[in-house]
């Protein structure tokens, strides 16, 4: 019986480690996009004269629309070819994913307790994951 318990715990631990090792498709897409961005940076900069509004705020979650407007500007001003096509395709897929996630923001009406639980979690995220500027 004791041996069975040890084997069960060992199997559970192995399953947990395997689950951590598996990346989500979005994480892989973002990693690939970062690599493409680094690879094609010089091509994207071009002659350096293009001016794109860039958010000053460091909390990128608050500036998603501005970031994607900048991406559209960059895409429209960059010579399209095989070199950057995959980059802009990936950025479009990431935007689509974010748009789908934003649709989850409009939720149902909940009792005050559930809202306060959500608010507490929200403030915890701000406190731990956002860069608070002075």
From Swiss-Prot:
Alphabetic keyword roster: Cytokine, Disulfide bond, Glycoprotein, Growth factor, Secreted, Signal
GO cellular component terms, A-Z: extracellular space
Matches recorded under InterPro entries: 4_helix_cytokine-like_core, IL-5
Localization of this protein: Secreted
Annotated glycan sites: 76, 90
Main location, first listed in the record: secreted
Biological process per Gene Ontology, one example term: immune response
Signal peptide (residue range): 1-19
Keyword Glycoprotein: yes
Gene Ontology molecular function, alphabetical: cytokine activity; growth factor activity; interleukin-5 receptor binding
Function: Homodimeric cytokine expressed predominantly by T-lymphocytes and NK cells that plays an important role in the survival, differentiation, and chemotaxis of eosinophils. Also acts on activated and resting B-cells to induce immunoglobulin production, growth, and differentiation. Mechanistically, exerts its biological effects through a receptor composed of IL5RA subunit and the cytokine receptor common subunit beta/CSF2RB.
Subunit structure: Homodimer; disulfide-linked. Interacts with IL5RA. Interacts with CSF2RB.
Family from the record: Belongs to the IL-5 family.
Name of the molecule in the record: Interleukin-5
Organism whose genome encodes this protein: Equus caballus (Horse)
């Amino acid at each position: 019986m004791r041996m069975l318990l040890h084997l069960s715990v060992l199997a559970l631990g192995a399953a947990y480690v395997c689950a951590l090792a598996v990346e989500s498709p979005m994480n892989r897409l973002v990693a690939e996009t970062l690599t493409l961005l680094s690879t094609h940076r010089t091509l994207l900069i071009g002659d350096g004269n293009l001016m794109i509004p860039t958010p000053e705020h460091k909390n990128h979650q608050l500036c998603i629309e501005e970031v994607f407007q900048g991406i559209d500007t960059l895409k429209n001003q960059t010579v399209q070819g095989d070199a950057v096509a995959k980059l802009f395709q990936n950025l479009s897929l990431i935007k689509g994913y974010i748009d789908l996630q934003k649709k989850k923001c409009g939720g149902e009406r909940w009792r005050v307790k559930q809202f306060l639980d959500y608010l507490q979690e929200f403030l915890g995220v701000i406190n731990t994951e956002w860069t608070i500027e002075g």
